[in-house]
Amino acid sequence: HWKAMPEDAYLYSSAFTDCINHQAPQEMKPETGSKIVRLIVRAPQLRDGERLGVLGADKALGVWDVQKILPMTQHTYNEWVADIDATHLEGRHLEFKFVAFRNAKNELLWETSMNRTVDLPEMKAGELVSYELDQAFFALYNRKLAGTQVPVFSLRTRKSAGIGDFGDLKTMIDFVASTGQKVLQLLPINDTTITHTWTDSYPYSCISVFAIHPQYADLHALPELKDAKARAEAEKTRAELNALDKIDYEKVNDFKINYLRQIFNQEGEKMMKTAEYKAFFQDTELWLVPYAQYSYLRDKNGTADFNQWPDHQVWDEAERKALADPKTAAYKNVAFFYFVQFVLDRQMQEAHEHAKAKGVILKGDIPIGVNRNGCDVWTEPKYFNLNGQAGAPPDDFSANGQNWGFPTYNWFEMLKDGCQWWNRRFQNMARYFDAYRIDHVLGFFRIWEIPVHSVHGLLGQFAPALAMSREEIESYGLHFQEDRFTRPFITDWVLDRMFHERAGEVKEKYLDRLDDERYQMKPEVDTQRKVEALFADVTDEKELWLRDGLYALISDVLFVRDHTNPSVFHPRISAQLDFIYESLYDNDKAAFNRLYNDYFYRRNNQFWYQEAMKKLPKLVQATRMLVCAEDLGMVPDCVPWVMDELKILSLELQSMPKDPSVKFGHLSRNPYRSVCTISSRDMPTLRMWWDENIQRTQEYYNTMLYRQGPAPHPLPGWLASDIISRHLTSPSMLCILSIQDWLATDEALRLPDADAERINIPANPKHYWRYRMHLNIEDLAADKRFVQNITEMISQSGRC
């Protein structure tokens, strides 16, 4: 019969069944009697090592004797079944209870309900009567877990090659488990190779949502190079790279690709004849073959922009057969890429199995976008809108919004086939993870879509969204002046305010007179992309300041036209901070504010709810992984509706409360179904945040930590421990802290330069992702004082 998604749905995730409670469904051995009564019940509350049984008044059910429990079989996750031979029953009325027990049956936990009763029908020989009963009545223990978040590339061991790899990941899993932590959260591990330069270090710009980045290969897990000289040279290079404080992306990847090619030449033919390789190829060939062809053509043509390739500008399905046949010349071109992905898949699956054996949940990350020049777009372009760019509106991370450059998704096409691309993506991820974070879950409600001619995110609009007609705009009391409100607002006083003594230079070089009051940008600089190209080779700070001023001129509008219907409009995000808004009369400002607040916070709520419910249920149900979401930023009211309905864990940061009426969140108010953290990869670490704004820190110190006097600077280790302990005791199911924040508790271990621990600066789209732990994990694990400190904090918080 129909069951709604239960409140305890998380207990059915592989995170809990496979990693925490270690449940393995058993084969049901049917009772051999001629008349069978089958009892079926769900019992997700059972803990690791507990089993379910049934006791009852009938002789066949033990006559309430705890030594005569009828054991039940877990035939699927959290669902138990018992078959009773009806010929042994004393009557047709059954009275019973379910009991939880461990191996010693004298340690019983009885159901807290009244006795269950069932009245059996008349049964004929050979019949089976099945009863699917209400969930077992045991108290639901809200299990709370602690964990660490760290990118794989940031891991460091004595065996690393200048970057973290899947061997280092196993070492980190061991360390996490040794401190009583149960979760290890990673950043995306997908291949991002576009230019073979450091700009490929951005882990969210994947070229394939299926392929793994070759930089994560554990070279020590591969066969040894037979050539002694090559082996010695490789070890020398590895040691040099590993001595670096930060990742040298280009040197590391050149070294790893070269090493993998040597191993491929030495071992590839033999390894690719194994049954293990053949099974891998069969499982993955749908995406693997085009990925390998794409990678070969990218390197052959010297560019990832397939529109510039002399041929193969679109994936040709007719070539699949030849590319998959070892006897063809085409196969030889791509075999290396098959081999590398086989190696990476095997190593990552080994790390996954190692984590499960250690009771650690590996939590992955689903990037919201893909690179517009990547394999996914090349292979299945129908799923992507290439006439826009995905990003995010302005927030605490970036005053101009974020422009990720990714194409937006063509959900019309994706929904036509039931989101098969997404299902394949999630199912592939389940090979390696038991939980995942949906990056920018708001994008499944509506994405911030920016014109391709924009650099900043300010000229974007939510897509889809209910745009406004002229009549609707005027219904708020604002007389709609289309030309004035949709063109950049450039006047003499604006130029003087922005450019000061350089205002005349700007007028002469970059502007044309539009009318008596206003100017317009010259055609050669009338978009931000044109301005960007004009200043492409400029490094002088004064000229870059001028460039940024030109960007700001172009985005100074009150409304933007809808991307699909230019006769309707969207209010420009953060327009209240610009000169066009300043120029309005007070009554027009008030009218615009009413319109603005209604549009962004009320008008689209039901519409966006419906959009999300078309997509997210399909994705959430594609696998048994535990689903968490990054729901920060401009969050409409409909987001918690959907997340609650689908039982998705929210993200809670005390420094970014979801309640706009408070400056800091109250940890005690975190919902159970949430992930609590202090900092993310887009934020300063705890130590950086502490010194970033002295006034804010002082308020936090007095009002949240309840301490008197001036806050100490820099953040002392004992106070970092206090802050972490408070987060650990929050109601959140998961408390996952960055490795940098864990290290902040120990002044002898932590990196002296707190600024060097920053992973990403979202305001900089060209940021170099190169943070490495400054300590070897082996040395960290050997520091008994640090391990004991972390273990005790976690244990005392009730997380286990």
Language-model segments: which ranges?
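A short, amphipathic beta-strand motif
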Residues: I36-R42
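Aromatic-rich carbohydrate-binding modules that target alpha-glucans
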Residues: H1, Q45-H93, F101-M123, A161, ...
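Catalytic cores of glycan-processing enzymes that make or break glycosidic bonds
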Residues: W2-S34, D85-H88, V118-C800
